[in-house]
Structures are given as structure tokens and as C-alpha cells.
Amino acid sequence: MPGEIQVEVAYALPEKQYLRKVKLPEGASVEEAIIASGLLELRKDIDLKKNKVGIYSRPVKLADTLNDGDRVEIYRPLIADPKELRRQRAERAAKK
């Protein structure tokens, strides 16, 4: 159908991945795709004010316009500081 795009919305947890395909009108935003996917109702831990989003691993804003075939990704907050984890790994490696 002209004027319509299809995108995927993804949200990954350590034990499960959610992947929803949604059809939207051309010019739809990232936020509209997330809402249409139903993931906000399914996963109450998703807060669009806190969770960052991206398209194919590139950070985007909720108001950004989607293209046909895009994959919208909802990212979980970091639970550990990456620099601290690297430091700890380096210390463990130095002890071996």
C-alpha cells in the first residue's frame, strides 16, 4: 500500500528478545513505532524518558522520522560502568 512503511521494534533482555513488526504511515516517528508495537504495555520497565533508542545501533531521538525497513531498538540502562569493568578485568588479568 502506498504511503505505508514497515519497521521492526526490538527490545532485548538477557533471557529474552522482543521483536515486533509494525506498519505505519510514511513520516511516522520512532515514538509512534514503539507505541504501535505494544511493547510499552507488555514491558512496564520501559520508560521512554529514561531508555535510549536507536536505529540499527545509531542513537536517535523519539521524534526522528522512520524509513521503510528500519529496526528501532530500545536500549536498557547500563547496570555497570564500562570503564570500571575494564579496570577490573585488567586487574584480574595482571594477577594471572
From Swiss-Prot:
<comment type="similarity">
    <text>Belongs to the UPF0125 (RnfH) family.</text>
</comment>
<dbReference type="InterPro" id="IPR037021">
    <property type="entry name" value="RnfH_sf"/>
</dbReference>
<dbReference type="Pfam" id="PF03658">
    <property type="entry name" value="Ub-RnfH"/>
</dbReference>
<protein>
    <recommendedName>
        <fullName>Protein RnfH</fullName>
    </recommendedName>
</protein>
<dbReference type="InterPro" id="IPR016155">
    <property type="entry name" value="Mopterin_synth/thiamin_S_b"/>
</dbReference>
<dbReference type="InterPro" id="IPR005346">
    <property type="entry name" value="RnfH"/>
</dbReference>
